[in-house]
Curated annotation (Swiss-Prot):
Function per UniProt: Binds to one of the cis-acting domain of the insulin gene enhancer. May be involved in subtype specialization of primary motoneurons.
Localization, UniProt: Nucleus
Principal subcellular localisation of the protein: nucleus
Protein name (database record): Insulin gene enhancer protein ISL-2B
Region (Disordered): 307-340
Low complexity bias spans: 307-317
Lineage, highest ranks first: Eukaryota, Metazoa, Chordata, Craniata, Vertebrata
Length: 340
């Protein structure tokens, strides 16, 4: 905190009277003895990198060790030149990107799964699934085959198979109606809008399709029956999938494909703050006075003149009289306006 231009140390909270003030971006000021790493107590200045986190200052080494990204396998940090592999939010060294069972290194293009933060190649993941599901009544392979059977057309239109032979007199000839694409499209559109059409809608369908009312009635009955069976079957599959997933005890991982290694970016660590050295304006005059043979009374008058800030209010004759008492200054020293 600053009070009327007075520099206050962030570390100890007292006013800074030192020769140097260390300023940490954006507006933090420290004693030179107070600005040090909170972990290793290394003094920090403008010659090293300083990090500030949660009000504490750290050197670069400790900041990377505490807050830097580490390999999910060996728990060691990365260098700026390291190539890394990523799986979800985990980052790995290329040498650490291996199957946790067979230790085979995964290369770009390999399929793998991430289970309990462990990498598994496709072969080992399949073996674990087979072992875990060995005692279950329905294996994952059977579930897949059943789900594939849903897409197959249901053979409702096929004539039923007779196990016994009827007499010739008992046989009845039934005409099988074959619907074309236009008729099917019309019936399906109406079914999606209303699975149970009323008499008026059925009459309109008779005119639009050219089918008999009986055929239309039977088609809607069969369609509702098939949809009901399909809904029940899907519900049973979901329940069985939930049971198998519980029996696997978390062995189901997320299938992934290894990508190409990328260069590790150190910018995730955050931008280091800048430490600047501040030197009061009278310091240069003080050092010059110690190295030169100056008239001490005249020098004290000059210092008090610069500290009082009355240079702008003094007359030109006073400045001339003071400067005449000083020896010739080197050409490298260029006067600049004083800070107030």
């Amino acid at each position: 905190k600053k009070k009327s231009g007075i520099a206050m140390c962030v570390g100890c909270g007292s006013q800074i009277h030192d020769q140097y003030i260390l300023r940490v971006a954006p507006d933090l000021e420290w004693h030179a003895a107070c600005l040090k790493c909170s972990e290793c107590s290394q003094y920090l200045d403008e010659t090293c990198t300083c990090f500030v986190r949660d009000g504490k200052t750290y050197c670069k080494r400790d900041y990377v060790r505490l807050f830097g990204i580490k390999c999910a396998k060996c728990n060691i940090g990365f260098c700026s030149s390291d190539l890394v592999m990523r799986a979800r939010d985990n980052v790995y060294h290329m040498e650490c990107f291996r199957c946790s069972v067979c230790s085979r290194q995964l290369v770009p293009g390999d399929e793998f799964s991430l289970r309990d933060e462990e990498l598994l190649c496709r072969a080992d993941h399949g073996l674990l699934l087979e072992r875990a599901s060995a005692g279950s009544p329905i294996s994952p392979g059977n579930i897949l085959s059943r789900s594939f059977h849903i897409a197959d057309p249901v053979s409702v239109r096929q004539p039923p198979h007779r196990n016994h032979v009827h007499k010739q007199s008992e046989k009845t000839t039934r005409v099988r109606t074959v619907l074309n694409e236009k008729q099917l499209h019309t019936l399906r559109t109406c079914y999606n809008a209303n699975p149970r059409p009323d008499a008026l809608m059925k009459e309109q369908l008779v005119e639009m399709t050219g089918l008999s009312p009986r055929v239309i009635r039977v088609w809607f009955q069969n369609k509702r029956c098939k949809d009901k069976k399909r809904t029940i079957f899907m519900k049973q599959l979901q329940q069985q999938h939930h049971i198998d997933k519980t029996n696997l005890q978390g062995l189901t991982g997320t299938p992934m494909v290894a990508g190409s290694p990328i260069r590790h970016d150190n910018t995730v660590l955050g931008n280091p703050v800048e430490v600047q050295t501040y030197q009061p304006p009278w310091k240069a005059l003080s050092e010059f006075a110690l190295q030169s043979d100056l008239d001490q009374p005249a020098f004290r008058q000059l210092v008090s003149f610069s500290e009082s800030g009355s240079m702008g209010n003094s007359s030109g004759s006073d400045v001339t009289s003071l400067s005449s008492q000083l020896p010739d200054t080197p050409n490298s020293m260029v006067p600049s306006p004083m800070d107030t």
